[in-house]
Curated annotation (Swiss-Prot):
It is found in: Cytoplasm, Nucleoid. HAMAP family: DNA_YbaB_EbfC. It comes from the Bacteria. Homodimer. Belongs to the YbaB/EbfC family. GO terms for cellular component: bacterial nucleoid; cytosol. It comes from Thermotoga petrophila (strain ATCC BAA-488 / DSM 13995 / JCM 10881 / RKU-1). Keywords: Cytoplasm, DNA-binding. This is Nucleoid-associated protein Tpet_0244. It holds the Pfam family YbaB_DNA_bd. GO terms for molecular function: DNA binding.
Amino acid sequence: MKKIKSFGGKNLGGGKQEKLLKDFAKMQEELQKKIQELEESFSQIEVEASVGGGAVRIVATCDRRVKDIEIDEDLKEDFDTLKDLLIAGMNEVMEKIEKRREEEMSKITQQFGIPGLM
């Protein structure tokens, strides 16, 4: 990059701007790498939701995959209640997944001084 001089002979560009751009590009690359690693780790992070006093329990991973659903034997005869509890449980586990994903992402963005990215 060619340095430009003002009327007073002071530099108007060049070195500092180039360094800032290189530093920013490096930081952006590191941030993307950390985010990719985090996305990959989400398959290992589990969250659990229990509804109906424990009658339905759902376990899912933060990559939004359901791993297990446990249903109390007493619900076998009450289809409507079972359906309502499954819906409530799925909604709750999805909310917990999103909250956990935001918490994990926040840890990374704080390292880079980028609050509120997620």
